[in-house]
Curated annotation (Swiss-Prot):
Belongs to the bacterial ribosomal protein bL25 family. CTC subfamily. GO terms for molecular function: 5S rRNA binding; structural constituent of ribosome. Residues 92-206 are annotated as: CTC domain. This is Large ribosomal subunit protein bL25. Disulfide bonds: none annotated. The N-terminal 91 amino acids are capable of binding to 5S rRNA and also of displacing full-length protein bound to 5S rRNA. The first 80 amino acids are not sufficient. Part of the 50S ribosomal subunit. Contacts the 5S rRNA. Residues 1-91 are annotated as: bL25 domain. Keywords: Ribonucleoprotein, Ribosomal protein, RNA-binding, rRNA-binding. It comes from Thermus thermophilus. Despite its considerably larger size this protein can substitute for the endogenous E.coli bL25 protein in vitro.
Amino acid sequence: MEYRLKAYYREGEKPSALRRAGKLPGLMYNRHLNRKVYVDLVEFDKVFRQASIHHVIVLELPDGQSLPTLVRQVNLDKRRRRPEHVDFFVLSDEPVEMYVPLRFVGTPAGVRAGGVLQEIHRDILVKVSPRNIPEFIEVDVSGLEIGDSLHASDLKLPPGVELAVSPEETIAAVVPPEDVEKLAEEAAAEVAEPEVIKKGKEEEEE
């Protein structure tokens, strides 16, 4: 699935002035391209809430170009917690590393026996050609008993998709009920914010 967003070239506009006007400064880049752009902040919010880092966002530019991209980084204002800069990675025919959502299906046998399913990862880092990007990867957990775990190597990847993480990475597990509280405390101690979201300004006020 892909989403579309109007983007405009930046021709000397200062980032601070663009933000005051309700625009979001950004950069679109790859190995062969590096160009400053901006998008409407409200429209970006709408699109990014749906696309996130998992789906292609096609930037529609004023010169008629439509460039497929992935959001690589969003810088947030520390105080207001709203985007103030975005990096778009422009896709080509070369394979790219990206996170693809995992869709868990089935009821584990261990859950029927009183255990609890822990979905440790909701997405997985893969290497894939832009033309083969899957909308999601289905994960069948119905065979998991209490104490069982499912690893990245167990995933049934679509054609053209390769793992970009260790095959031993744990994706899901069925645990006894008494272990749930301990796992919840450990999860709360970890950084909950996605790696793509960064706090603070990184672009100079030109």
